[in-house]
Regions:
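Extreme N-terminal starter segment of soluble prokaryotic enzymes
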Residues: 1-4
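Core catalytic region of metal-dependent phosphoesterases/phosphodiesterases
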Residues: 6, 11-103
Length: 104
């Protein structure tokens, strides 16, 4: 497993979908300003990323940045994963919460 790190995607889903350096069981971490969850009732970008994660058998993790919809982020169910609390956005997409330490 390899961990791939990027940041400041600012809702540019194509940037993540075009990245082709992953292998089975890899993880892509977005370190702030993920931006895919901005408008309520618009989950099209999350659906694209989830389908991509299923197809490539990878995980998407993200840390929030200052350009996020925090109200939406706080609405996702919280669970324990990677040794800390995460917000479960979908089966393959998790929000890494502030103040937590993770072992990935």
């Amino acid at each position: 497993m390899t961990i791939h790190i990027t940041g400041d995607t600012h809702s540019d889903v194509s940037r993540l979908l075009k990245y082709n350096q992953t292998k089975l069981n890899d993880t892509i971490i977005v370190t702030g300003d993920f931006g895919m969850l901005w408008r309520r009732n618009d989950y099209s970008k999350i659906e694209l990323l989830e389908q991509d994660a299923i197809t490539r058998n990878i995980m998407y993790l993200f840390c929030d940045g200052n350009h996020e919809n925090f109200e939406m982020l706080e609405g996702y169910p919280e669970e324990e994963k990677y040794g800390g609390k995460v917000g479960k956005v979908s089966e393959h997409i998790y929000h890494l919460k502030r103040g937590e330490v993770y072992k990935i």
